[in-house]
């Protein structure tokens, strides 16, 4: 049965015409390769089973490889599947096994949402004892139910199509790590006194009986998370050449301390888990007039823990990683809320994750800094996406919706843009682009540069007037 991996590499691997780490990105981001370049894209479908057009295309390419293969390969295929003639059902089964093989390789590096980690050797062992009549039925007429039954036999869980990436916090799946459990012992430093020694021993004694796991480790995680959230800069004591805990450590090294792993994961999560993206400013001619600014303009409420924008309103921002942001908590008005306000504690909570760590961020802002005695003025534009995982939009083929500030200089409203790619988003704030809201299309308001008798020109109009367009 050890021939199965060799067979998959000979017949299915040539159908993957892409660069390295593409399969890793495929399982993390959901779609990270050009269509037609990877056979695993057969499993990226919103339908009940595989996409018929994509399957037919790869089957034709696979059949050409099958005709050129060696007699030994045909003999191994007959020995494993008891088939002399290549059929589409056998191709679908081989593609599924290749999908499982690549999944096992990815799960050696990191843990993914709802994907069970099993070694490929164990998969081969279980596949060997799969009932022959069920295998023949699958080869004769492949369907989702037959493939799902085989998947249940191998992994003891249902097959998720497409590849599961729809979670509350997709970024954190990168940092779940290998065998990440909450039973790590936290080392306590204390003085050698009798009344002090009895307290840790008592905690250790009752922690083994607690059904909630190791509460000391949970408390330590909470302290680390709160510190990383409140501090602007901090150091994490990471061993040299062991910065990436996703990569399996060498046998001579000890396990990476889980509390340090959690600190590293929290730090990376704070930088990656967000629904607000900063846009490059190619041209400053769209800098807004400060005469029309309001104090509450362009403020979005971001949950620092899950990264979602909580005041996007009723706008439905489509995204491959998106899900409905509707809260399951209802108030007296029977309306769903993204923000929960407690009348007892006078504290607001995120209705998606329950966190109190809420931050306010402006999607358009002019700021002034002093650098080496020189006054520097900056203009920042930002976009709000429908997912909290910013890395999912880095693929050129992914289309998504965004909320951006209106391009009119006298308007402080927002615009909902549909089917935007990352290339279009990076070129959005440029001289030739125009994205105005519906109100600005039917009205005109004068800025400082439009008034003939304007004496004090605002800061925004000065930037728009003096900075040369690119």
From Swiss-Prot:
<dbReference type="GO" id="GO:0016032">
    <property type="term" value="P:viral process"/>
</dbReference>
<dbReference type="InterPro" id="IPR004339">
    <property type="entry name" value="UL49"/>
</dbReference>
<keyword id="KW-1043">Host membrane</keyword>
<keyword id="KW-0472">Membrane</keyword>
<dbReference type="GO" id="GO:0016020">
    <property type="term" value="C:membrane"/>
</dbReference>
<protein>
    <recommendedName>
        <fullName>Protein U33</fullName>
    </recommendedName>
</protein>
<keyword id="KW-1133">Transmembrane helix</keyword>
<dbReference type="GO" id="GO:0019033">
    <property type="term" value="C:viral tegument"/>
</dbReference>
<feature type="transmembrane region" description="Helical">
    <location>
        <begin position="80"/>
        <end position="102"/>
    </location>
</feature>
<keyword id="KW-0812">Transmembrane</keyword>
<dbReference type="Pfam" id="PF03117">
    <property type="entry name" value="Herpes_UL49_1"/>
</dbReference>
<dbReference type="GO" id="GO:0033644">
    <property type="term" value="C:host cell membrane"/>
</dbReference>
